[in-house]
């Protein structure tokens, strides 16, 4: 009898649930409101784009509670300035139809924090692992809401990208731009000023624009033309009307309130849209989406109980300080993501799609917080390490080693070569641990499966785009959880000492050790001099394996538990025959046989610096193959002057080339360019939030002025480029490093012979047009 009742109860529960199998392709926030929960006073209705096992898409919904103050702490915002009521009001305003949908200046970080934190809480609550992974979802038949997800075994689904092209340009009145810019006391990028000006108008502007979506199955094209009045829409031949469909879901969000209707545009043949800067107009996209949003939801929503979704854009353009990465994030409507590729190159597109899939769309939107948000625990509940690292390290280390490890609070950096030193005809090698600090983190927290996946990819040398988010993950850890950060740093320092000891036992002298890697040379024990170069890699690989084994043995001894396929992986980055060390952060390695080199610490910007770096490297090679006679020194001196004259000639030939002298900048104040650009400013507004290059110029009265040249298209007329002042610090470094090398080999070096007075050539560059 008891079994019958249990079976009936299970059957009744199943009947109340709709079960679907497939994968989640995308999630976003549909609406947010306050609730009566004291600790998590916000409820978010989230939209899920779901693809079933037959490849058909559906709109699904779920709710999750969150706290504005917890969100603020995670994102480094002031929790005392953020209330749940304020956030609910902000999101409600974003659901009003007929308004320009870009994020206001003071809400950029709030929207970014709110979206990413909500989606992290949603994934944690429902229990799905990642986008495109096989899952069973359970939908409450009474409420229409997804209540749980259950991961199932099987291959990860492949994204179905569509290609997005948008075209259109809004001309904003110069006076409007200037008045908007005046509100930014610290300045702002032109892209931000323009979007802010459009936001002030509140209405959707009318202008000629075009949107095209192309998939393997169909092509959707709409052109909107401002031809007199009213505003007209044109369809084109060979055009699909079925690329997405309107779906009406009835949801019960509160049993004390009537059901609501959630309308959504559900795609039929794509689950993400890929675009490139060359084929993308942000203003055209936002205007198009705003018009669709207005048309779909502009009916009498109260009588029809339609819940209007948020429509809000955040990107580098909405950040008043700009950003150094490009992305486009539309929150809420229409219900699919935009993936931006840097170029139309297939590799770049693949990397962009991979980044979307591997991070659930959080990279680069969430920046360093990406893999913190993808952890299997709630963002505000980071667990404690499984081991007491401080105690265990003190037990498994001598007092001297423990003290040495504790001295380096951001990672151990040592260099045994106290003075600039040239090493010639030796068995030199460079080693690095791959994803070192992220791997150590996994040793403390092996259940972080999303970090596990990407670290495993990096250990296999896959997906080079992962290098930055993994690196930034470790960098942010200090702010989010300093105790865990210091534990990892301390473990890393102890491992570096273990590796050095192992290397020394094999007669390899680490010249420089920097946090997660080293370079050095094999020594001849009997003569205490570097061993000559070796013909094969056998001894280097023996060394690599021994050092890696000692690192992993130490990790195991102190209790680190790495997940499957993860171990500390020491790479042999290169074998060399010559080296020049100036300090721990500046060195040159060269292989005489294959001419492979690694030059660290010399400036790379502007492009002139890369020519100087190449010239210096050429001289270093010349020095290494020369003997230490006075005749050889004279030959090097002559060659040095040839290199200098060649650099001077290259600089002169490029004296008017903006791209040759421009450098990336972190300055984002473009207010002074509004009058200069006038109505033409719109041509570059859409990239000024993230793509920024400046060049130093000299005006007619001798003043140095920095010009953000990336704002202008094609050839631009500038004052004389300040070539000499660009060259001065680069050539000073060139001479200083070169003299150090020469002094390591010859005793009678005349510094003046290798120092260049570039100032005496200023007359060549005064009028460089």
From Swiss-Prot:
InterPro entries: HSV_HEPA. It is found in: Host nucleus. GO terms for biological process: DNA replication; viral genome replication. It holds the Pfam family Herpes_HEPA. It comes from the Viruses. Keywords: DNA replication, Host nucleus. One of its GO terms (cellular component) is host cell nucleus. Component of the helicase/primase complex. Unwinds the DNA at the replication forks and generates single-stranded DNA for both leading and lagging strand synthesis. The primase synthesizes short RNA primers on the lagging strand that the polymerase presumably elongates using dNTPs. The primase-associated factor has no known catalytic activity in the complex and may serve to facilitate the formation of the replisome by directly interacting with the origin-binding protein and the polymerase. Associates with the primase and the helicase to form the helicase-primase complex. Interacts with the origin-binding protein. Interacts with the polymerase catalytic subunit. Belongs to the herpesviridae HEPA family. This is DNA helicase/primase complex-associated protein. It comes from Gallid herpesvirus 2 (strain Chicken/Md5/ATCC VR-987). The lineage of its organism: Viruses, Duplodnaviria, Heunggongvirae, Peploviricota, Herviviricetes. The gene is MDV020.
